[in-house]
Regions:
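Short coil turns that delineate tetratricopeptide repeat
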Residues: 41, 75, 109, 143-144, ...
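Canonical positions in the second alpha-helix
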Residues: 35-36, 69-71, 103-105, 137-139, ...
């Protein structure tokens, strides 16, 4: 039996690192990647894998550094461009994320995650129709991805197409992938449609799968607050303002301050009291009367 070649041995080490990342055993994955780099200091894929670990551990500066080292050795390393796009997106450097995605799409035009990232950015910027188009492209490439289908549901909800949104939400759930990301996006979609019970159910599933994720925990707490109808009623104007341009919001506030000043003051006081009361009720529901940090 012939012995394994050096290239085959390196491929086995790549697979080992990827497997550890999939298991969220990031410390071991880092040790394996660093050991590989000691043996193969010019291995662009090893640098890209190390960068990927740092994205997963939310150390975005390190992820950008090591992906840059990978691209110095191979300017078209596919994983390195994907890591850079995610690192910029997750650290809220959205313009740089778009630039990285553009370059990544040139290198790997059939990678659906670039279209997904662009869609997420356009959703954040209120460009819902463009976002929907990018999500549909991602689904054309990978039709069985539950997170992409959930994002299409969210985009449809933001566009006011609630029937289509519910249909895509069902399709995402039928893909039967246990993913905290998918459940979180479906929760956003349900909230946008006004399906608050469904919103809370999806958040419960997300937090079950990843109870330590800060974004999911915060969304779950907010979901519990919004389960109180009075809070939702008072929150409605602020939800509407999010869809408006800043100058429109300013004009409405100025007009309300001039015409309805006493009522506006009462509304603000009631809103603040309701916000903190529901926050207290949620805390007591989850943790009892203990307020220790």
């Amino acid at each position: 039996m012939s012995s394994m070649t050096n290239a085959e041995a390196i491929d086995v080490r790549y697979s080992r690192i990827s497997h550890l990342i999939g298991l969220k055993r990031y410390k071991e994955a880092t040790e394996e990647a660093e050991a590989l780099l000691r043996d193969e200091p010019e291995d662009d894929q090893a640098y890209a894998l190390l960068a990927l670990i740092y994205v997963h551990t939310e150390q975005y500066d390190a992820a950008l550094h090591w992906s840059s080292e990978s691209l110095k050795r191979d300017p078209e390393n596919r994983l390195a461009w994907l890591v850079r796009t995610n690192a910029y997106h997750d650290s809220d450097k959205l313009d740089k994320a778009l630039d990285a995605a553009t370059e990544g799409m040139r290198v790997d035009p059939y990678e659906p995650h670039y279209y997904f990232i662009r869609a997420n950015i356009y959703l954040k910027r209120g460009r819902y129709a463009e976002a929907k188009s990018y999500i549909e492209t991602a689904l054309d490439i990978r039709p069985n991805n539950a997170a992409y289908m959930a994002s299409l549901s969210y985009a449809e909800a933001l566009l006011g197409n609630h029937a289509a949104s519910r249909q895509h939400a069902r399709e995402a759930l039928n893909l039967s992938v246990e993913s905290d990301t998918t459940f979180l996006i479906l929760a956003w979609s349900a909230e946008q449609r006004g399906d608050y019970e469904e919103n809370l159910n999806m958040l419960k599933e997300a937090i079950r799968l990843d109870p330590n994720d800060k974004q999911i925990r915060e969304a779950y707490m907010e979901g519990l607050q919004k389960s109180y109808k009075m809070y939702r009623i008072l929150l409605a104007p602020f939800t509407l303002f999010k869809r408006m341009k800043p100058w429109q919001v300013l004009l409405i506030w100025l007009g309300a301050a001039i015409i309805f000043r006493p009522l506006l003051l009462i509304f603000i006081i009631v809103y603040v009291l309701t916000h903190w009361l529901t926050k207290l009720l949620v805390h007591v529901k989850l943790f009892g009367w203990s307020f220790k940090k």
